[in-house]
Amino acid sequence: MTKYLELIKKEIDETELSVVSKKVIKSTINKIQKFNEEQYKNPNDLIKIIKTFLKNNENLNTSHTFIAHIKSILKHTSLKDMISEIDQNEIEKLFLKYKNLKERKDDAEEPSKKHQENYIPYEELVKKYKQVKDKLNWKDKLIYGLYVLQPPLRADYGDVKLILDSDETDYSDINENYFLLGESKMIINQYKSNKVMNKEGEFIHKPLIFMVDEDVYDLIYDSVKLGIEEFGEMRTYLIEDRFGKKMKPNTLSKNITRISMLLFGKAIGIQEIRTIYCSRFQLQDEDCSIETILEDAGKMGHSISVHIKKYMKRYVKPK
């Protein structure tokens, strides 16, 4: 790989780019040269290096600058003749992705006065809940745990059917949501943004499917066990109201706010818990991880644009 990169450096020197531009672009080439020569031997391996660098880098500005320089190298040197069209297209996609993220860097909004007053850092929400959860009744313990221990932190948990034996039960109806007890798997079919556009321009169904972590599974399992002891049979839905019906989003939201008042003396609702979670990292922070933001948006079931514009707030964090 080194001989190809040295050739590209010479070609950069021969361009009409400014002295500063030449210097910073060659600095990016130096970063590429630091990767294992035995593992990455020729230009066809460049895309692997690019993806590895972007994956491991935590800083948005650095990532954007890096991929922008690669794009500039493609434009001004023979690199475009050394790598495949597929890789060139992949580089273009990566450039557009990081360009879009950088342009949105300052889009995060200030929280409302109410949201700021109710703000508690996410890690403190989790810590406090874990400290006092055993003092809550099993239903409150379950409801709040679902919303602070693991994303997607949605208002759709009241409409989730409990499935004891997934091998013998049909759970293919996309109009229903399911939790498979035997597999620790949550399948959320019905939620606000469950339609995405495919390459043909058609909207298709996109379920949220994820494994719950051990803490959440234990909460659900214990609640099922206690529910059977209390009512003599397993309930139908993950969260039910006092009439044994699935809990409606509005009722669920009121319960979350009520439990927040018990725990923190603040009326923190579902929407605020979502924004607190999504704002763990600030776009303005130097150590903001782009991959984490992309991962968070995917888990929450909304677009990157919605994630940044609606849910990432510039909270004033307590000292």
Where are these regions (language model features)?
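Non-catalytic DNA-binding core/recognition domains of DNA-processing enzymes
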Residues: 5-95, 271-276, 300-301
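Short, charged amphipathic recognition helices of the HTH superfamily
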Residues: 45-46, 66, 153-160, 287-298
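Flexible interdomain linker/hinge and immediately adjacent N-terminus
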Residues: 83-130
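Short, amphipathic alpha-helical "recognition" segments used to contact nucleic acids or chromatin
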Residues: 143-147, 275-287
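Conserved tyrosine-mediated DNA breakage-rejoining catalytic core shared by Y-recombinases
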Residues: 160-216
